[in-house]
């Protein structure tokens, strides 16, 4: 029987642990360390909880210590790993306030990512084992269940008068939180250093649609601005950028995350952004040491190269692959496309692969084709929304490199999966033009937007 130690019980860790227990539990001893007090919190639902679009946080958990131990794992919660002796294969952790040593034969990192801490004048950021705290009251981070709970508790305390909120960061989390706070009746300003929201996921013509959507719902955009300082007498009163000053009562820092690889200790090869560099079996540069989820690299099929794409969907898949290989059952990952989506005030946006800007930066002779149309024939008078699609492809090989879609019709979310597979399998734009796509007025048009975008692609 092999002894496998897992460091971290986040999405990747939970997927990894469950895969090992469900398939190879009789063959292995599984020991888990996690520095948090809870397991499997769905951070993607945090904004829904804060914005009161769901009843509470209970449904945002899908596993816990008891469930994992019932399957046969030994789980240590509130137990940060302090160091690892890779030569002697020993993990040192803090368990119930005491030093605890655990030997291993295989080691799996599922340590996730940590919030990026921007240097901001007037507020000192204190980093602890589990959370980040700011010395100025009402400067908040968003990552853990505890972070969301703290924000909700503060907003529920009417005596604090937290009516004006600045969200720093215009990525997915920042945009979702801006919507959540506005739904609570708060005055919201969204600040980002770049001149658009959702930068990197969509090209600018698409991000402008989301920007207009936010402004139409009374969210003020302060784009292309760098936060310089947060001012206040003990608590937040003002946020200062290089262009403006905003009177606010709370600041949410959502500028992004970086891989949590502090335990590498200079022994494990890291990617350029600090992530564990892994192969397609999720193994690091040290034999028998694996890394899964946000702490590790992935193989990007669009770039045809190693990359870093932190998504829960990638975390689950890499967790499964890492589990098989750590248990001695060889399995290679097939790579990812970075498929993603967002829904704000009923405007749905999905994308996969590379944007045109990213494709050119990656060295492709890239161009795009697009099409705007109704989802269904014009005679379908109800629930018939406009759809915009963009397909990015390489002019030399004709291979599809990426796709973006936006609509108030949620049905587009399924279409992006086809493009994800197309990128993975190196499908050309010309083959897509003749792909068998069914037609029924309840769903689409005989010449639907996917077909038309491909047919009108540059030759």
From Swiss-Prot:
InterPro entries: FAD-bd_OxRdtase (IPR050260), FAD/NAD-bd_sf (IPR036188), FAD/NAD-binding_dom (IPR023753), FAD/NAD-linked_Rdtase_dimer_sf (IPR016156), Pyr_nucl-diS_OxRdtase_dimer (IPR004099). Keywords: Cell wall, FAD, Flavoprotein, NAD, Oxidation, Oxidoreductase, Redox-active center, Secreted. PANTHER family: NAD(P)H SULFUR OXIDOREDUCTASE (COA-DEPENDENT) (PTHR43429:SF1), PYRIDINE NUCLEOTIDE-DISULFIDE OXIDOREDUCTASE DOMAIN-CONTAINING (PTHR43429). Pfam families: Pyr_redox_2, Pyr_redox_dim. Disruption phenotype: Reduces total NAD(H) levels by 22.1% and increases the NAD+/NADH ratio by 20.4%. Modest decrease in the ATP pool. Extended lag phase during growth in media. Increases susceptibility to erythromycin, but not to gentamicin, chloramphenicol, rifampicin, penicillin and vancomycin. This is NADH oxidase. Its cofactor is FAD. Catalyzes the four-electron reduction of molecular oxygen to water. Plays a role in redox balance maintenance. May be involved in mediating bacterial adhesion to host cells. May be considered a potential virulence factor. The modification Cysteine sulfinic acid (-SO2H) is found at residue 44. It comes from Streptococcus pneumoniae serotype 4 (strain ATCC BAA-334 / TIGR4).
């Amino acid at each position: 029987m092999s002894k496998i130690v897992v460091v971290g019980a986040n999405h990747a860790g939970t997927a990894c642990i469950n895969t090992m227990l469900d398939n190879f539990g009789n063959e292995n001893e599984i020991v888990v360390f996690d520095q948090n007090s809870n397991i499997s919190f769905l951070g993607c639902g945090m904004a829904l909880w804060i914005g009161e679009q769901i009843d509470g946080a209970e449904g945002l958990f899908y596993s816990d210590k008891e469930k994992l131990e019932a399957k046969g794992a030994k789980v240590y919660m509130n137990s940060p790993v302090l160091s690892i002796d890779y030569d002697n294969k020993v993990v040192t952790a803090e368990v119930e306030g005491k030093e605890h040593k655990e030997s291993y034969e295989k080691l799996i990192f599922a340590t996730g990512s940590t919030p990026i801490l921007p240097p901001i004048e007037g507020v000192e950021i204190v980093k602890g084992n589990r959370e980040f705290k700011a010395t100025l009251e009402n400067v908040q981070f968003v990552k853990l269940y505890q972070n969301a709970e703290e924000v909700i508790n503060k907003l529920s305390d009417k005596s604090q008068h937290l009516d004006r909120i600045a969200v720093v960061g215009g990525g997915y989390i920042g945009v979702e939180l801006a919507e959540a706070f506005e739904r609570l009746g708060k005055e919201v300003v969204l600040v980002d250093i770049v001149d658009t929201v959702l930068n990197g996921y969509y090209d600018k013509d698409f991000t402008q649609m989301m920007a207009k959507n936010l402004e139409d719902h009374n969210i003020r955009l302060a784009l292309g601005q760098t936060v310089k300082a947060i001012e206040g007498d003990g608590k937040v009163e003002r946020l200062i950028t290089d262009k403006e000053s905003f009177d606010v009562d709370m600041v949410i820092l959502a500028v992004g995350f970086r891989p949590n690889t502090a335990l590498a200790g200079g022994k494990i090869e890291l990617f350029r952004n600090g992530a564990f560099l892994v192969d397609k079996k999720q193994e690091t540069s040290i034999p028998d040491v694996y890394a899964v989820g946000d702490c590790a690299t992935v193989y990007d099929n669009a770039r045809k190269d190693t990359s870093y794409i932190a998504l829960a969907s990638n975390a689950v898949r890499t967790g499964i692959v890492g589990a098989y290989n750590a248990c001695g059952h060889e399995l290679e990952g097939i790579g990812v496309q970075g498929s993603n989506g967002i829904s704000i005030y009923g405007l749905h946006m999905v994308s996969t692969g590379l944007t045109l800007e990213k494709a050119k930066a990656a060295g492709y002779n890239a161009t795009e084709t697009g099409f705007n149309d109704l989802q269904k024939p014009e005679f379908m008078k109800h629930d018939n929304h406009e759809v915009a699609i963009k397909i990015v492809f390489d002019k030399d090989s004709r291979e599809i490199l990426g796709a973006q879609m936006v609509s108030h019709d949620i049905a587009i979310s399924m279409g992006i999966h086809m493009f994800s597979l197309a990128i993975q399998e190196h499908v050309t734009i010309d083959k897509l033009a003749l792909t068998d796509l069914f037609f029924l007025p309840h769903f689409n048009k005989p010449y639907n937007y996917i077909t038309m975008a491909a047919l009108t692609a540059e030759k």
